[in-house]
From Swiss-Prot:
Protein name: Proteasome activator complex subunit 4
Entry keywords, A to Z: Cytoplasm, Developmental protein, Differentiation, DNA damage, DNA repair, Nucleus, Phosphoprotein, Proteasome, Repeat, Spermatogenesis
GO terms, biological process: DNA damage response; DNA repair; proteasomal ubiquitin-independent protein catabolic process; sperm DNA condensation
Modified residue annotations for Phosphoserine: 1121, 1614, 1746
Organism: Mus musculus
Gene disruption phenotype: Mice are viable and show no obvious developmental abnormalities. They have reduced male fertility due to defects in spermatogenesis in meiotic spermatocytes and during the maturation of postmeiotic haploid spermatids. Testes are defective in core histone replacement.
Spans of repeat HEAT: 475-519, 998-1037, 1179-1217, 1354-1392, 1636-1674, 1680-1718
Amino acid sequence: MEAPERAGGGEPPEPGGRPVLGPRAFVPQKEIVYNKLLPYAERLDAESDLQLAQIKSNLGRAVQLQELWPGGLFWTRKLSTYIRLYGRKFSKEDHVLFIKLLYELVSIPKLEISMMQGFARLLINLLKKKELLSRDDLELPWRPLYDLVERILYSKTEHLRLNSFPNSIENVLKTLVKSCRPYFPADSTAEMLEEWRPLMCPFDVTMQKAISYFEIFLPTSLPPELHHKGFKLWFDELIGLWVSVQNLPQWEGQLVNLFARLATDNIGYIDWDPYVPKIFTRILRSLNLPVGSSQVLVPRFLTNAYDIGHAVIWITAMMGGPSKLVQKHLAGLFNSITSFYHPSNNGRWLNKLMKLLQRLPNSVVRRLHRERFKKPSWLTPVPESHKLTDEDVTDFVQCIIQPVLLAMFSKTGSLEAAQALQNLALMRPELVIPPVLERTYPALETLTEPHQLTATLNCVIGVARSLVSGSKWFPEGPTHMLPLLMRALPGVDPNDFSKCMITFQFIGTFSTLVPLVDCSSVLQERNDLTEIEKELCSATAEFEDFVLQFMDRCFGLIESSTLEQTREETETEKMTHLESLVELGLSSTFSTILTQCSKDIFMVALQKVFNFSVSHIFETRVAGRMVADMCRAAVKCCPEESLKLFVPHCYGVITQLTMNDDVLNEEELDKELLWNLQLLSEITRVDGKKLLLYREQLVKILQRTLHLTCKQGYTLSCNLLHHLLRSTTLIYPTEYCSVPGGFNKPPSEYFPVKDWGKPGDLWNLGIQWHVPSSEEVSFAFYLLDSFLQPELIKLQCCGDGELEMSRDDILQSLTIVHSCLIGSGNLLPPLKGEAVTNLVPSMVSLEETKLYTGLEHDLSRENYREVIASVIRKLLSHILDNSEDDTKSLFLIIKIIGDLLHFQGSHKHEFDSRWKSFNLVKKSMENRLHGKKQHIRALLIDRVMLQHELRTLTVEGCEYKKIHQDMIRDLLRLSTSSYSQVRNKAQQTFFAALGAYNFCCRDIIPLVLEFLRPDRKDVTQQQFKGALYCLLGNHSGVCLANLHDWDCIVQTWPALVSSGLSQAMSLEKPSIVRLFDDLAEKIHRQYETIGLDFTIPKSCAAIAELLQQSKNPSISQTLLSPEKIKEGQKRQQDKNADALRNYECLVNTLLDGVEQRNLPWKFEHIGIGLLSLLLRDDRVLPLRAIRFFVENLNHDAIVVRKMAISAVAGILKQLKRTHKKLTINPYEISGCPKPTKILAGDRPDNHWLHYDSKNIPRTKKEWESSCFVEKTHWGYYNWPKNMVVYAGVEEQPKLGRSREDMIEAEQIIYDRFSDPKFVEQLITFLSLEDRKGRDKFSPRRFCLFKGIFRNFDDAFLPVLKPHLERLVADSHESTQRCVAEIIAGLIRGSKHWTFEKVEKLWELLCPLLRTALSNMTVETYNDWGTCIATSCESRDPRKLHWLFELLLESPLSGEGGSFVDACRLYVLQGGLAQQEWRVPELLHRLLKYLEPKLTQVYKNVRERIGSVLTYIFMIDVSLPNTAPTTSPCIPEFTARVLEKLKPLTDVDEEIQNHVMEENGIGEEDERTQGIKLLKTILKWLMASAGRSFSTAVKEQLQLLPLFFKIAPVENDNSYDELKRDAKLCLSLMSQGLLYPQQVPLILQVLSQTARSSSWHARYTVLTYLQTMVFYNLFIFLNNEDAVKDIRWLIICLLEDEQLEVREMAATTLSGLLQCNFLTMDSAMQIHFEQLCKTKLPKKRKRDPGSVGDTIPSAELVKRHAGVLGLGACVLSSPYDVPTWMPQLLMNLSAHLNDPQPIEMTVKKTLSNFRRTHHDNWQEHKQQFTDDQLLVLTDLLVSPCYYA
């Protein structure tokens, strides 16, 4: 609903105050509707207009005056608050201006990160409701966002710690892009493709980056007429890529996310049908389910599975439409995985399956909502042809309901199932609710399985609303309600906590939905009722009975939970956690029931609870609280009737018991007195107006009991006072009934049954508000004057030292003061007083916004808040000076100070938890299908109340006044006092206060740091610790030690370091050491780079000016004069200069601190750590710090050395001179025209990038005329529009400079590294071991050396050379690692050296590397691998030809044994793999070299060769739009291999275990050669199973028969490597993804092998088949011939002569039936039954001595096949009994007396049937006839088991 237009008066504006509105006010974009329902709604328009006008004016001014901080941030925060309070209550024009301004601000390039994040979050919020602004209203460019993401997420300097970003930044940026995406211009898709396509090189990490960018940036919600500029430009290309990749590289998942979004935004505009089988196959594969008889999962599958959420969105968006294909596949998917949902299954895959169940219905409901109920907006609607039809919905619900019902009892709990059922019931209650109820009724009866009860109730709660409202589809729903309620009552059980809680929730949910009114009388009066209504009417007669029984149950619960054992007096104020939960459950359920009762039932219940409470005396801790809660609930519902009963009774008892004055001084009071006080204090928490009748009695009681000596007594009396004040002064709704106006109308007018499950009507909520009347307010003041005033006078005197008070008296007085304060928080105006000025300079106003919260404060009266403040402060200093150990009083004082500062009627933490529980209840009962806020009335009222509380709590960003300052200083004093508990409580309040007042931290920091000053002698250890805690902050609030502000950290960081010299500091105390550790850790974790440049570009200022000029609403403020703007710019320049000054000052002060003589080492380390945070990418570190870090490279402590290494690497990056680049035209260089369409891979126009040993630059001239391209991915997919390479040597920064040519910073480094002593020491340190056996190649040290050689070229080589030569020859682990790090740095650092220098370098390096590579050991070969890989990464291979030629010399020379050979290959592989597609020549050379060596003897070399082959063939991918590779190709290689394996393939016998491994002398026969070759080939196939992007299936198929022959059947470790590998390899190959065209090929191989003479091969075909079919389920299902072939294959193998093969065929059959790949049709059944009837030959009389035939007769085999087939059918439904099952079991049982192995098979089948059906036998029994049951019972417990 749009708001009615507002009338704007034309009165003259008051200067500066009221907002000016034009003659017709604006139309708000979207308000928060709940504001309209507040009792003071009429005042809000004026209030919000004023605020909006102020925000527009001041935000605009701040930006124009270049004041990002404090002005800009202050007013953007105000805008966030405004949105939280009023929604998007501004005109469309303002909305667009706000967005544009923030977009400009976010994209300021040098903006400080924390500001950027703040602006981004607000911008996300402004863009959140995209239906409010169409593409016509708003257009946002995409490039600024791309620059932002590139700069931050792909930062080039973050890894060197020159930038610190917060962890949250990634999500914020991605959400920001997502929010702006709908508004990108139409041409942006083409621009993005042009920008990121060149990155798409599948072997490179850039692929991941390209696809990530596509996923988050590509716009998919363009209108249909622009589709040709949108997804049509990339859809075929990317889906082609997705369909053809294998093995889930990480980016495949991101493609899925992109397609899911595309599908959702364009339902009906894309034909997905061709891809559906592939999509479902992949989704099924990505669930990683364990399948088949040999379960080896490819390890890579586990890490990169699809995100289920996106897969679900994709499926949902493709549903519907004419073809219904998706629904068919979805049904297939659930059929195939249903059995995994059975509660007896558990595994790491279960979570995914549950998430699938939970998300799918939710997603379908959202789609239905969008298609049928959502208000149309500018977003493309779904075309009629593709909307989901009713039939679609029914099919969907039917296919998912089975798994959901199974999941109800899952091991992980019933939560997901309940959420799924809730959504399914919205769509098809008639299909969903009956089966749930079927499971619920028995669960309510069972005593032995409480978890069933919990699970079913949870699910019924989910469907409650659909059940009760009884739609036309499921009219009988409501009739179940009463039986369910009555049966749930026994669940209120004192002995079972969780059962109790779920029952409360269950009863509470149903009573909220249904008026508990007895309508049975209507039957006589009306005759127009339907049958169901009649049934309901007569049932409602039971309501009264239900309520009374429920109360009896609760009374039982209460009596059993009485506090029998006396707990220790001190801490028993608290209930145990469980007790308090039960208390909460009980009281909220009871109050719901009474709210929903008719007057008649209520009166009965009231009488009952009254009688119960007055006839017992309860202890006040547990039982008393519960009873009092029940009474309070009753009184709240009908205050008049209830107070009449309770108040006189309690008043009587209390007056009676306190007649005698002795009572006042008793330490222990009478139980009855305490109980009545407790009862009275609870029942006064009701509508204040109703209490006024009893004020005399209540005041009398307060006078009698407030000053009791007994603490328990006066505390209860204070509660009474507190509740009286609250009830009379707060604003709150007085009833939460589900129908406005309640149910007390005669049945002739009102028929409650019609209101079952009815939602509240937001526009006719009819909230009954309690707004304090003048009478109530004066009563509240009367209470304060009578009870608060005297206490304040006493405490005032005590604080002045004029009156001695005992501690107990002080405590009592404080308790009364505190109760009054929190009772009247709403009544007392906030603290006044002058503000603390001069904390921050600002040119815009930073004024507070005042919100009206329903009460006009009476300012003529004395403000008790201020009186309390002054009295308490005086008292506090008195106590701290005289009796600091009176901790109880101090605790209360801390509470009082906190409430004085913040409490205006509600507490933040209570509000937060209520907001949370509101959201939970909303979720559990919402109707997502219809949307439109159709919540039940109570929930809507609650939401309005929360809106009111939100307003009372919006005090953050308050003005910081003197009085606040005083109180915060008091808190600081308490936070550093002697008692740890006092400190702890005070610190929590202190942190809350710091967060509430603007800029107060700057005022407080110096005071905290006072305690850390090293020159103070009077600081105690407690004060020191307290101060440190104050700096540390709590986990949520401010951390003073690390405010993102130069002015603050310039004080705190140096103070932390110097505090190490304070005499209060003691490193012996572990608590202090831990504090410093925590502080350092927190600073490092939370530090974000602080800005040095706060300039605002012109583009922002222009929009800011528009914002200030925007009318409706606006305040009359003059526009800024040019002088003002100049002044703003001047100030901003000063601020930049200030920041820089502060930065340098901080570095220097920290250095001073660290260099103090006797500073303990811990503080030195902390200081150096802080210094290292100050490295930046926009300023070089000051010289003194550079000198410091370089010196510390040789510090004694390894921690310091590590920090110094990082820092110096960063400094070298800062000092890096920029290298000039120029644009080239790759087509000119190659002399080829530009290709017309995209073709990736090896093309003529990128051939010049390849390594070609004929054209390698070997002379200076060739070198300088070559065009080098360093990054490996350029040119593979296509060329970028603007291809940039480094310019020639003469244009680059000068090399070989003398010391004089360098800047001072460089000289510092130059001097140290030219000094042989320094270098020697450095190398000694670097070659020490750090953590034994766990050290790895260190990227930090590599960066250090790379920087040294990049910035100073070969200046230091002479000094280093002797060290390198020495280190290389030393085979110790740490020395080898050190030299590997230096060499990698050298090779990478020499990227820009001149040819002469490079040539000299390789003359030095080649001999070094040869030595190193022959000295590798087990510990170091990894490091050399990393070294070479790092050296080659992103480098042009032509520049490294020395290295590659060296590596290829002869890797398998045999020098140093097989181990060194394997290592050399490993290192070579590392280098070549980094070069990807650019070194085909080298790959061919390597393959040629390796091929004759494939028959290697040594296992480690074979494994390594296998892995190297994977990398050699990695480039041979079959991706779409990709040219055939010039690198080695798999088919040619496989052909050559098969030729050599002929001797093995031709032979038909088994290949035996071959152990004749080592060195057979002389020529081996071909066969032995073949076996060795095969071992290597197996290693290759296993290595590539998880790595390559596409499997060359055709080639592998030719090897399959051979593997089938070798693979063993049993798992036996005595087999040799060959057999084990063959088995593993088959398992991995069977999990591979197949393309449709490969299916016939593979089936041909399988059926050929199934005729093999080796039964091992036949057996293995079956295990292979199981896995292959499941992992490619829909690809096979999509091909009818394939299904037929497989079925035929299995049926043939069922009749195999080998018993094991027959049994495995049966297992396979049952598995394929179970996942619904095959169906049990009559043809199959008849076939098996025929086989079973095969006549067996007569038994011959055997001679006693002769052995029976070992070969079974053909007849026996046939008959066995039939029995196995039937058995497979039985076992294929392990969890239910289909209609055909009983007869099959009967047929089977006929064979129990057949000869073996038939008898055994039948027994096994029966015992399995019994095992799987035992759990739900009661249910399954129904499927059998009585005769069948008799036979079955006989069989299942037949004596033959025991015979």
